[in-house]
């Protein structure tokens, strides 16, 4: 029995489509990787397809095959980052942090490792570390040309920096970060961050403005934000004690 003919055109289209999907997700850290070795790029696309489908074991196996071909810093940055992504998806936090930290060493312009590290620190209430990583990610993004820059990520980074600085009681810097955030597209829940900031600054009027905007844009967050800002304004929230 003869094998069916290979439709190379369809196969090439599938590869290009997969590459574009991953490029949109991972941007600058992916685009320059293995630029001179298309066979390795095909392996990388295959690895990312498996990782995105949560087949982390197969994805990691393919990454191991790719490792000997890491020649340039761009290759090493991408490879190291995606190993970190495997550990993240596998729930191995310590290994994830180690690999993302290693990826961050291969070029300041790659913002993704810093965003991953920032969010990890932020969710663990390590606000100073989170703020520092967000600042570095912002620097990376601002170094890019306006055409290449992801303004949604930039708006998110500034908003999360605002949150970290608010929790550190660095209100002047937090408000500056919020002013910068508003220059870019913001997530629907961003007004919750602003409401908490202004409550911490004891500005009830601005707090109310952002809660109203939250009601219009992201009503699912209204109740918890109203309660938190009420406690902050009343001086009963443990993270924002009233100075006597």
PLM regions and their residue ranges:
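"A position-specific structural signal for the A-helix of alpha-solenoid helical repeats
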Residues: 38-41, 45, 82, 116, ...
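Terminal, low-structured helical/coil segments at or just beyond the last alpha-helical repeat
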Residues: 208-244
């Amino acid at each position: 029995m003869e094998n069916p003919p290979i439709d190379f055109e369809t196969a090439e289209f599938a590869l290009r489509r997969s590459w574009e999907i991953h490029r949109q997700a991972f941007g600058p850290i992916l685009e320059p990787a293995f630029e001179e070795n298309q066979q390795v790029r095909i392996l990388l696309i295959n690895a990312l397809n498996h990782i995105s489908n949560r087949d982390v074991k197969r994805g990691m196996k393919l990454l191991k095959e790719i490792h000997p071909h890491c020649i340039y810093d761009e290759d090493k940055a991408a490879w190291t980052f995606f190993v970190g992504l495997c550990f993240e998806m596998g729930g191995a936090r310590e290994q994830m942090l180690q690999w993302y930290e290693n990826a961050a060493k291969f070029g300041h312009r790659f913002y993704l490792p810093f965003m991953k590290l920032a969010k990890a620190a932020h969710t663990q209430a390590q606000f100073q570390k989170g703020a520092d990583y967000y600042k570095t990610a912002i620097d990376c993004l601002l170094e890019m040309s306006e055409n290449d820059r992801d303004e949604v990520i930039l708006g998110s980074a500034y908003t999360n920096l605002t949150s970290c600085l608010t929790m550190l009681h660095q209100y002047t810097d937090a408000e500056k970060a919020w002013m910068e955030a508003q220059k870019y597209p913001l997530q629907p829940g961003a007004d919750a961050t602003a409401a908490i900031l202004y409550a911490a600054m004891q500005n009830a009027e601005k707090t109310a403005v952002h809660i109203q905007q939250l009601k219009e844009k992201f009503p699912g967050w209204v109740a918890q934000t109203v309660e938190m800002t009420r406690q902050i304004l009343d001086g009963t929230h443990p993270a924002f004690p009233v100075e006597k």
